[in-house]
Amino acid sequence: TRDEVARAILKEQLNGKKVYIDLRHLGIEKIKQKLPSLHNAALMQSGVDISEELLEIKPVAHYTMGGINTDINTKTNIENLFACGECADVSVHGANRLGGNSLLEGAVFGELAGKKAKEYAFNREFLPIDYSVVIKNMDLVQRIFDGDCTKNFNAMRISVGKIMFDKAGIFRNEVSLQEAFDYMKYLRLESNTLHCIDKGKHNNVELISILELRNALELSEAIILSAMKRCESRGAHYREDFPFTLKEGNAHVLIKELQKGFFKVHYEE
């Protein structure tokens, strides 16, 4: 499966070796027919013609086993909120989604979420708007606009991905996870000093990027804490210090942010 292949590839690369995929036996006609996007991407990005050359490969993040906790009808614990697709965890894939199965979440549960939300809306009054939440988020946006930016946003964004891959990615252990968590806490504080250079209020891509980075840091902390809680290996979650799978580990790790930077983590059958 993908997680086993990813570990095997990375293990070779950590030992200084390169790993390649060989598609030359397929021939140019079959490659253009069956793998046109891969053929074009390899040519454009790496200058490699996969019908004649080996293509160097490496593992990357593909899918997150987890998401917003929902029931089988896509309902969340927040009234009037339904979730589907890759933002949600309806628990159909377990610890490792296999290739070709992504349509289940998007098509099947996407349709179900729409139907259930419609049924629910017809039988409910709209909840009153909590303007305190609106004002809180408006204040956050205004703080991002105010002030001069002295931090390198791109460097911070790149470091998030690198640390998460190196310390909390394919191979994990208690030490690496703690190091990743400490660094994310540091970056989360640093992200408060990010401000927009572009002060325009209309379609401000810089503002969106800063908000996305703040969300990514919050999510990274949640992923790390969940990985620290699960003292076993299961699917794509591989702990070098706990390489075995526990029978009693067949349960969800649920995480909830009680307030900024403070999480509650627990198992739920």
Regions found by a protein language model. Give the residues of each.
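Glycine- and aromatic-enriched mobile tails/lids
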Residues: 8-14, 63, 69-83, 87-269
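An anion/pyrophosphate-binding glycine-rich loop and adjacent beta-alpha core
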Residues: 1-53, 116-122, 162
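FAD/FMN-dependent oxidoreductases across multiple families
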Residues: 36, 41-82
